Amino acid sequence: MVSPGPVFGIVLLIIARVSRSAGIGFRFASYIDNYMVLQKEPSGAVIWGFGTPGATVTVTLCQGQETIMKKVTSVKEPSNTWMVVLDPMKPGGPFEVMAQQTLGTMNFTLRVHDVLFGDVWLCSGQSNMQMTVSQIFNASKELSDTAAYQSVRIFSVSLIQSEEELDDLTEVDLSWSKPTAGNLGHGNFTYMSAVCWLFGRYLYDTLQYPIGLVSSSWGGTYIEVWSSRRTLKACGVPNTRDERVGQPEIKPMRNECNSEESSCPFRVVPSVRVTGPTRHSVLWNAMIHPLQNMTLKGVVWYQGESNADYNRDLYTCMFPELIEDWRQTFHYGSQGQTDRFFPFGFVQLSSYMLKNSSDYGFPEIRWHQTADFGHVPNPKMPNTFMAVAIDLCDRDSPFGSIHPRDKQTVAYRLHLGARAVAYGEKNLTFQGPLPKKIELLASNGLLNLTYDQEIQVQMQDNKTFEISCCSDRHCKWLPAPVNTFSTQTLILDLNACLGTVVAVRYAWTTWPCEYKQCAVYHTSSMLPAPPFIAQISHRGI
């Protein structure tokens, strides 16, 4: 016969072990933490995490001693996850979020404090998005201004890659934080994106309520690594798994390095921009998909440099498809709380290296960033906005001319687009002028461009505008100097063409102009005209 003492001791030990094991797996998702910003009304914020299968989880939102709301759910198998959607909340705070897991008589409690409600924006892309405030112009002043923006909270995802879609982040680079000179200026390409921070700061200046900024970027990366397999399949992207970094690639070369020839030999060009992972979908899997349950206001994106010489012609499909896929994923992941067609902003590529060279494919990528429309929103890219950056060159950047340091102007132009597209602000100029009519005046040897806005011609040269001149089935691009201009029209001289003019293009080079000195701007906002290319009809278009 066994004495009661040892049996009772064994029972207590078993109960203790069960109790501990029941609480070990109970946690919030990786990005639910102190100081976070949750999406405000009209959407509901999603709170989720992991727990013990079969357990009940009660999520309570409190402010001081007041209980604002309670939501009850259970831990689902086989994912061992729980999730609730909070009722829509007005902007403000701070609040506390408490989650309590109950399994039989055992309770385990988690808390996060100083939680705000506002708008949450995800920022992603490659190195120009990854650059920190310490790397930009006037860094000291920008870092000294953080005290005024304690309601703009920041979060940064670690550099992680995965062959499969992850449900949660495996690492966090910077957990939700109030901005400081330390975490904004932590070093080069670490912690927090300068473009993201400045964009959020400009939004806060306008909206005057909390902004949450989530940075998930990796320098030197193709769009393919940020795209799901669904996106790549939809665009017929070859399923390459090449891990080479910085290896020479074969690409066509302009004959004698000029842009006038239509056929070119091939040469080997070192791909100096590719320093990140190259395996398709690995960053989508590890750095974007784990965020899918987060309720978002929108996304801003700065990427494309690496695709200037890699799958360039597929970019016009991949970028709109990426936007559509991200929208669908975040909508369903957030239980329908993130808008199905949430606003998506992006930066059109700036300049790189050699002046007046189109050898790096930048003009084509800029065009493909708009799905070959030249402007956004457009039928293939609804509810999008773009910051044109062709005039923000920086040949003296210590990080290379591909990394211009004026991120303030980039972010300001982005925030104008957000105010117009995401927030519906009326009568706000948020993009530069584009031709709405192109008329060939053949008898006078002139081409008349009528713009959709008032224009200011900042500079006249014989290189910015070009015409495609065809003779005997051979076409080449020739300069078309500005003849005259007025408030909304600009006339080009076609005398250089002795054949038939079939197309016109503007700013179609890697380096279109010097800093803020491109040819055409909007008169009052001084937003630059974006690059364009258009076929010419003899009856006008």
Swiss-Prot record:
Glycans are attached at N107, N138, N188, N293, N356, N427, N448, N462. Gene3D superfamilies: SGNH hydrolase. GO terms for biological process: carbohydrate metabolic process; regulation of immune system process. GO terms for cellular component: lysosome. Keywords: Cytoplasm, Disulfide bond, Glycoprotein, Hydrolase, Lysosome, Serine esterase, Signal. InterPro entries: SGNH_hydro_sf (IPR036514), SIAE (IPR039329). Residues 1-23 form the signal peptide. The keyword Hydrolase applies. Its EC number is 3.1.1.53. The two subunits are derived from a single precursor by proteolytic cleavage. The lysosomal isoform is glycosylated. Inhibited by diisopropyl fluorophosphate and diethyl-P-nitrophenyl phosphate. One of its GO terms (molecular function) is sialate 9-O-acetylesterase activity. Disulfide-linked heterodimer of a small subunit and a large subunit. Catalyzes the removal of O-acetyl ester groups from position 9 of the free diacetylated sialate N-acetyl-9-O-acetylneuraminate (Neu5,9Ac2) in the cytosol and of the diacetylated sialate residues of sialylglycoconjugates in the lysosomes. Together with the sialate-O-acetyltransferase they regulate the balance of acetylated sialoglycoconjugates, key players in various processes such as cell-cell interactions, host-pathogen recognition, and tumor antigenicity. This is Sialate O-acetylesterase.
